[in-house]
From Swiss-Prot:
Protein name per the record: UPF0253 protein ASA_2184
Pfam families linked to this entry: UPF0253
Taxonomic source organism: Aeromonas salmonicida (strain A449)
Family: Belongs to the UPF0253 family.
Length: 68
């Protein structure tokens, strides 16, 4: 997925990080899993979206990608 395919909030954050306005998160995969976990465990979020977040987090945990 390319940044231009993402929602406006992600594109804004991307531009802020790229410009140095916002700090880069060095542990990006762990931060992503924490965010997905928050979505997956929030009962206010629709069940289908919670399941998508859980699946995405599980895939990251199983993958061989690791934070540097």
């Amino acid at each position: 997925m390319q940044v231009y395919q993402c929602c406006e909030a992600i594109r804004i954050a991307y531009n802020q990080i790229g410009s140095g306005e916002q700090g880069y998160v060095p542990q990006a995969i762990a931060a992503t899993i924490r965010a997905l976990n928050a979505v997956a465990s929030d009962e206010r979020v629709p069940a289908e979206l919670r399941q998508e977040a859980a699946y995405a987090a599980a895939n990251l945990l199983i993958s061989d990608h690791q934070d540097a």
